[in-house]
Amino acid sequence: MSPALVLDTGALIALDRNDRATWALLRVAADDSAIMQVPAGVIAQGWRDGARQVLLSRALRHCDEAPLDGQTARVAGLLLGKSRTTDVIDATVALTANALNRTVDTVILTSDPGDIKLLAEALGSPIRVETV
């Protein structure tokens, strides 16, 4: 069984640019019916023109969107303070993965492993991070 995947903006950009390795990870996860989530803020960072982002649109059809509500925003802010990092969207990626990791092995696909690892450490979470 494939681990659950949480995608950050770097992963969306890689998919949009038709990065074969990132697509392979997504295909394996989809074939295994693994959970795949993308925080809403990540979509906002990566989405520019749906008519031109056909590959990204196709990839997002396989993913569930994790909403960014007020409660999540507050917890993300606390996490940023604890981790001494500044990217709100990275914090929501870490929080999404942390929530999934309670029930299923979870991997974050990111182009920014440094900050993501700091956030995971601040959560005390054994989330795996894979660079794309």
Where are the model-predicted features located?
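Short, hinge-like loop/turn segments at secondary-structure boundaries
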Residues: 53-57, 83, 126-127
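Acidic, metal-associated active-site segment
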Residues: 46, 87-107, 111
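Acidic, PIN/NYN-like endoribonuclease modules and their adjacent C-terminal/linker elements
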Residues: 2-4, 102-132
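Short, well-structured N-terminal submotif of metal-dependent ribonuclease cores
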Residues: 1-38, 45-63
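Residues that scaffold the ATP/ADP-binding catalytic core of kinase and kinase-like folds
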Residues: 15-16, 76, 119
